[in-house]
């Protein structure tokens, strides 16, 4: 049975509080828009596809709870809800993609009345979830062929089932190759400062029985130098039209290291993460988070009181460092500007 990160239950958006993993499996019930927005901002739920699914359910929740008497009044509420949700994590394009799709669906059925909008949005949120899950499995099928025979893969952050509707993006090729009986061993970057690798990816791989070794972020170069890494597979929060990739802070450094050591560097992401309206990585907004997440771990200070800390949550990897992008429609290779447009036109 696959892990489900977010779901609709008894008129509420339910999700696993990923801040509590791996020690506690706690389900959070979001009963209003404010709770959904907080879940996204506080990283109770995280990972671009999972955020998109959560936001879609959040829009459906707003519609269900609305007392609007006319479609136009309900649409106004939904526009406001979209603005609230979109502002929570600005780097992840799946968030605005999902809320935009929900709003378009509401507008499409507005002539049928308020109840039609409510029913349509609930169905659309479920469709977004189901599509994301299917895309993850397709990414796994396409990407498994890229894993070298020895199967030593380095990952960064968490782009597994917890970050998506299920199965994952970066972990999907690994899981598929493992299911095919091929040798796989995953080197898991701990991923400071939020430790998504150590807390979440390591936990997911343990649940799946996939061999792994947890490493600190500053061990990656050493592991590459010693010949321990055959390829790198990461996820993405936004892919610009030219193939530049925004992902968890530290991804860019791994891409530079991989290029120096002649190691393939792959990005796995659904097509909903591709943003053709963003020309390059220079145009991607980079979220700045609370410096306390750097100076503290699990509420415990690890730095002197009063020290200043930087905390950009993402960085941008230039397209020339990306060997290929694995999508649900196939593997995209350079030149990305033309290849990504061709991929999108094939929808």
Swiss-Prot record:
InterPro entries cross-referenced by the UniProt entry: IF-2B-related, IF-M1Pi, IF_2B-like_C, Initiation_fac_2B_a/b/d, M1Pi_N, NagB/RpiA_transferase-like
The keyword Hydrolase appears for this protein: no
Catalytic activity, as annotated: 5-(methylsulfanyl)-alpha-D-ribose 1-phosphate = 5-(methylsulfanyl)-D-ribulose 1-phosphate
GO biological process, one term: L-methionine salvage from methylthioadenosine
Residues reported in the UniProt entry to bind substrate: 46-48, 89, 196, 247-248
Domain of life: Bacteria
Entry EC number(s): 5.3.1.23
Biological or metabolic pathway of the protein: Amino-acid biosynthesis; L-methionine biosynthesis via salvage pathway; L-methionine from S-methyl-5-thio-alpha-D-ribose 1-phosphate: step 1/6
KW Transport (keyword) present: no
Annotated Pfam families: IF-2B
One example GO MF annotation: S-methyl-5-thioribose-1-phosphate isomerase activity
Keyword entries, A-Z: Amino-acid biosynthesis, Isomerase, Methionine biosynthesis
Site (Transition state stabilizer): 157
Family under the similarity heading: Belongs to the eIF-2B alpha/beta/delta subunits family. MtnA subfamily.
Function according to Swiss-Prot or TrEMBL: Catalyzes the interconversion of methylthioribose-1-phosphate (MTR-1-P) into methylthioribulose-1-phosphate (MTRu-1-P).
HAMAP family xrefs: Salvage_MtnA
Annotated protein name in UniProt: Methylthioribose-1-phosphate isomerase
Organism annotation: Chloroflexus aurantiacus (strain ATCC 29366 / DSM 635 / J-10-fl)
